[in-house]
């Protein structure tokens, strides 16, 4: 009986895993890497997913980094196309935006996005 239970659990997890969706895939048509995903559920039930898109190919401070979002109104069964939330210029204080954290305040019906911005890599920054 124990083996049957283990097999049933394995089968269920396999079925769940096959229903997963990759929202941001490095190697897609952009040719750029995606990193640092974030997700939150808004008061209206929508799921909002964010990720860095890194045209510069590296970390914040090495060039342009954007934050993209995708939204699901059906609890993740389908998703919108990716749209930019913040777009880096590649130089200066707005060179890149990344390492996003997303918080949904359901009482106030607001979203808070916190991220890093700039043109200096972390290891070269000063306090």
Question: Residue ranges of each PLM-predicted region?
Answer:
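Asp-box/BNR beta-propeller blade signature and adjacent active/binding-site loops
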Residues: 18-127
């Amino acid at each position: 009986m124990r083996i049957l239970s283990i097999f049933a659990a394995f089968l269920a997890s396999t079925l769940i895993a096959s229903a997963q969706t990759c929202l941001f895939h490095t190697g897609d048509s952009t040719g750029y890497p995606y990193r640092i995903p974030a997700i939150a559920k808004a008061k209206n039930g929508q799921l909002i997913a964010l990720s860095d898109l890194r045209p510069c190919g590296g970390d914040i401070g090495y060039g342009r980094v954007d934050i993209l979002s995708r939204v699901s109104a059906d609890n993740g069964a389908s998703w919108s196309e990716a749209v930019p939330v913040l777009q880096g210029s590649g130089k200066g204080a707005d060179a890149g935006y990344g390492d996003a954290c997303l918080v949904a305040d359901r009482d106030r019906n607001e979203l808070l996005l916190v991220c890093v911005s700039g043109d200096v890599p972390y290891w070269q920054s000063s306090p």
